[in-house]
Amino acid sequence: MKETAEAFLRRHDMHFAQMPFDELVRRYRADMDAALAGRPSTVFMLPSYIRADEEPRRGEAVLVIDAGGSNLRAGMVHFDENGQPVIDALRKRRMPGAGGEEIDAETMVEEIAAFALEYARDCRGACIGFSYPCDVLPNGDGRILRLGKEVQVRGAEGLLLCSALERALQRMGAPGERTWKLVNDSVGSLLGGMAEADRSRYADYIGFILGTGTNACCRLPSAEIIKSPEAMALGGVTIVNVESGCFGRLLLGTADRELDAVSNIPGDHLAEKMISGGYYRQVLRQTLRIAAREGLLSPESAAALEELRLTSAMVDAFCLEPQGDNPLADALSDREERSFAAEINTMLLERAARVSAACLAAIVEKRALPAGSRVCVCADGTMLRLNPVLRPRMEAILRRECPEVEMEFRFIEDATLLGCAWAGLTGE
């Protein structure tokens, strides 16, 4: 069935070989360079205004907040005399607005501030890792652009989050005034990797998230961020948020176009819709539905696929045992159909691995690292952690296509909290 599956994917512009790796890297590079210069691009290259070549202050505790999709964490972190991060205190609760009932932005801010209040009393620095789109400002604050579907908060768009949190803390009696910074999840992962890793081991660091969504960030000379005089004025090396999930210079296949047309954001986040866990399961299911429409699967399988609500865990199980006891295998009529679907899944995951690896290769190429350099890919996300095919294929592609640079994936526990600590204890 391999030839039939391959021919089917090629006919629908969905075979991985139809996007040559070198061309993907070239397009990523071109878009990165255009965005840095302020020209039209499908990626954003947003400066974080955080210097990446400064060591965090030692012996000083900083308030850290991790506002994720479903959970909120707050605590204190300091770096010891050896420069190693130490979590002094930590607590967790559900993210305000994630309980199913809509709240307003003021309530969200009040609940976050109240949750962090006991730690804020002892810190003059603070940093929040915010997992939703924000416009990070030169002063470290962040303006909320929108919140994801995981939380229901009205009136949050346009809010300067750090300023609002500081005002709320002062109303609650927190002494003094804290200096705030806001980082997104990929920046937090990169800084968390720098905080935890043996920094003598790596020539560079990349933050890479591939879970429900996807994003990457990198370290660049501030002088290269031509579109931002404030970032250029920082000097040295700063961290840049690629917003790689928005990359759009891709060959979209039939299933990609059909899913994009019915999405909440048609024409946007095209790479994310092709590779991330929140979308990949839909791409696989839609591709199999198309195969059923064309008579490549039985009517019984077609009906079962219509009823199946495919999850990432189901995809992972099918990767491991395509003929086994799992919902996707059970939805297909016989061994031959399961083999066909397994070939489709393998080739679509290869496509996702290539698109993901091309982003990392473009960053490494732009950094022009010496041959023999080792790069720490500070990684996070369930798709990278749990899917049994994707990351091994990414690593194999990178070894083949970028043999002069070793890219080592590291999953850092509490990466966002440690990254917030690094950001909050550098600069003024």
Task: Give the role of each language-model region.
Residues 78-81, 128-134:
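Short glycine-enriched loops at secondary-structure junctions
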Residues 65-73, 131, 186-187, 208-213, ...:
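A short acidic Gly-Thr/Ser loop motif
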Residues 60-66, 125-127, 179-181, 205-209, ...:
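Short glycine-aspartate micro-motif
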Residues 93-110, 134-199, 204-206, 222-246, ...:
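Glycine-rich phosphate-binding loop and adjoining helix at the ATP-binding site
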Residues 72, 133-137, 215-217, 249:
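Short, acidic Gly/Pro/Ser/Thr-rich loop/turn segments
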Residues 1-90, 94-124, 170, 195-196, ...:
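ATP-binding/phosphotransfer module of carbohydrate and carboxylate kinases, centering on a glycine-rich
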Residues 84-87, 150-156, 191-283, 289:
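Glycine-rich phosphate-binding loop of actin/hexokinase-like ATP-binding domains
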